[in-house]
UniProtKB/Swiss-Prot annotation:
Designated name of the protein: Sensor protein VraS
Modification type Phosphohistidine: residues: 156
Reactions this protein catalyses: ATP + protein L-histidine = ADP + protein N-phospho-L-histidine
Gene name linked to the record: vraS
Class of this enzyme: transferase
Amino acid sequence: MNHYNRTIGSMLILVYSMLAAFLFIDKVFVNIIYFQGMFYTQIFGIPVFLFLNLIIILLCIIVGSVLAYKINQQNDWIKTQIERSMEGETVGINDQNIEIYSETLDLYHTLVPLNQELHKLRLKTQNLTNENYNINDVKVKKIIEDERQRLARELHDSVSQQLFAASMMLSAIKETKLEPPLDQQIPILEKMVQDSQLEMRALLLHLRPLGLKDKSLGEGIKDLVIDLQKKVPMKVVHEIQDFKVPKGIEDHLFRITQEAISNTLRHSNGTKVTVELFNKDDYLLLRIQDNGKGFNVDEKLEQSYGLKNMRERALEIGATFHIVSLPDSGTRIEVKAPLNKEDSYDD
């Protein structure tokens, strides 16, 4: 309303000022007879002088209202641009449905650099947030990794050694002549200790995984299989094609292999696990398969941390992750990762 009042008032002052100046300058036009005629002559029963004033006021109101409406449009548009700028949007005049006056454009052109500076500040804030997150993420991962290493050392130095000692003692006892029912219970105890040792090795593999370091993916998997062949009663075989794999996905695939073998050792109750790695020209295929008891995939996929971790690692490198498992028919895990031939030769 302030714009309307100011505009109409200004127009009234302007019109009456011009009329007064005109009457003052034109001495001939201003005379007693004229004023008498203005007061005594009527239009629609209204004196001409009063009628003309009403017409002037009405015209000022109409014209002033139109001008005030236009000014309000300009101000509302500028206000909208400022609000958009504060909300992080890019200001512009391409989406406006009103005529923009030159004065408004001058104000808008002053606003554009401010909007650009706000955008830069937001980007800097995001970068700082990301940097802080990355720093904190690295610290957290380092803390977790150190704690996993510590737990692995303690388990290896205490529980693993005790299980080994118990296994040796049971083997020695078996060599002696035992009376029933001890002769039947000792093999059961020995089997329990062996299962515990297998579980412990799988747990240590999970807590303290081997790294590729300077090895290729194929070399790392071969070394892992050879190491397991010496330590676990399960038969571990491999069929590995050694080829160049982009460094960005090698570590993820190796961790998936470790996780899959660890789960097999702990839960499958099988006698054999096979690890395969093939180059299929435009993609690689990693397959881990066992002949264990199998499981219900739909139930385990959401409950098992290991399976979810493998799937997430596969998705991070743009690979597909499939599990096929049937009761008493074993489990097969397949990961297919795309290969970029140009990138595969970049170290």
